[in-house]
């Protein structure tokens, strides 16, 4: 029989109709001779009723044999429930079954197919096809589909052209590690899976496409965390002849459309703008969460004269005030925060509490001479907790920024119903890498420097500023973009500033430099992390919850066992040899 509709879409207007439904058995209950079954499909749950007085003995026997996750087909008449279930969209109706067929049986599942399960992540990923049957997972992926549909429609309206770019590309330095693909035809040569379509989309601007977009898979071989995966999806945009502001306007309108169509939320435009230096100074992060206060405050000069060398001789002393939280944190709790501080490079964490108008705590005795000044500067009140970090400015900002977010979660200071978007602008072009011992691109080496600082490409690289912009949502980097270099001489200067010799630049990027000899237009763009965006819209804390088949934190797939070893013959065809891991060798 042909399915009449989805089980989750049956409503009161269907009462009296004979329909056929297909799906999975959720629960089976035997009550007073009747059998009740929750039939589940992708749209929801429908209650089935099998009455022995109204069905054949064969149907009754089949119903009695049903177990969870059996796949069945049922036909019957829609009727009103005697007692409606307000928790279900189908709760006012039920199906009086007249025919029942088992389409497939099922073993006992390793976890219940319901929301709020306690199975560990690897078990869920091992049986991902079962995990995806759970309503919340179905809803997450349906939300993702709505988001991509909304994005495509909007960009199509603005005459952006959807162009596919290659997955097999060239490995280039800078940024995260590439995933490499050996070439069988060209022995000893490797493709790289793209970390982004950055260069190819710029070349599309040179080709005259003017407005390009793509919802595209990208790949980065990096350490994983909750909002990262080795393969991820981004909404990639590039435009010609537009200003930084015009690109941001398009992006804001795109996000506003998505928020309205998928969540029914009206967002206020334009989004606030914050300079990079201000974000770091006030929030200790280049992706500030503005849903709560607790701003970082600079006390370097206030404490300069105190008889406490940790403060008086430190390059910077900064603090956050946790309002009214003195009783929330014991010394043991603060010791735990000190360990967190050390993870960010801080040597320790100083603190005081305001108790009956006086400062109490390990460093309070050093601050008695400036208590009034400190109280005024920090606007202190009774029961406040003050946390200090004395270190370099970078360490102080990073440490207090991390503690700020941690404390806000612990104290429930964050309104999870808020969506606070903002732009972080006026970025440094370069950032110092301790690991590499040199300056590296803060974004990528194709970013256009601000004209008034471009002369420092041959001078102090720390002073070069980029025409770059990141869009931030609730403490997450949602995406980033910039205007791009389109002049060959400036691009060559950029490569030189990054330590490339002329030969190295030509070897890695010669095709791009050559393209700049042929009328490369001014251009710029942006990329939005689709997985992260949907994660935030869905109220999840890990992008695995909005990806159908993700990897775990070891970049492996417990279901398929990828990555796996391959046959020796395959390696020989690629002229590859795998060295045995020293830790696996036996003596």
From Swiss-Prot:
Gene3D superfamilies: Bira Bifunctional Protein, Domain 2, GAD-like domain, Nucleic acid-binding proteins. The keyword Ligase applies. One of its GO terms (cellular component) is cytoplasm. Residues 198-201 are annotated as: Aspartate. It holds the Pfam family tRNA_anti-codon. It catalyses: tRNA(Asp) + L-aspartate + ATP = L-aspartyl-tRNA(Asp) + AMP + diphosphate. GO terms for molecular function: aspartate-tRNA ligase activity; ATP binding; catalytic activity, acting on a protein; nucleic acid binding; transferase activity. It comes from the Bacteria. Keywords: Aminoacyl-tRNA synthetase, ATP-binding, Cytoplasm, Ligase, Nucleotide-binding, Protein biosynthesis. The keyword Metal-binding does not apply. GO terms for biological process: aspartyl-tRNA aminoacylation. L-aspartate binds at residues 174, 220, 443, 484. It is found in: Cytoplasm. Its EC number is 6.1.1.12. ATP binds at residues 220-222, 229, 477, 529-532. Catalyzes the attachment of L-aspartate to tRNA(Asp) in a two-step reaction: L-aspartate is first activated by ATP to form Asp-AMP and then transferred to the acceptor end of tRNA(Asp). HAMAP family: Asp_tRNA_synth_type1 (MF_00044). Homodimer. Belongs to the class-II aminoacyl-tRNA synthetase family. Type 1 subfamily. This is Aspartate--tRNA ligase. It comes from Streptococcus pneumoniae serotype 4 (strain ATCC BAA-334 / TIGR4).
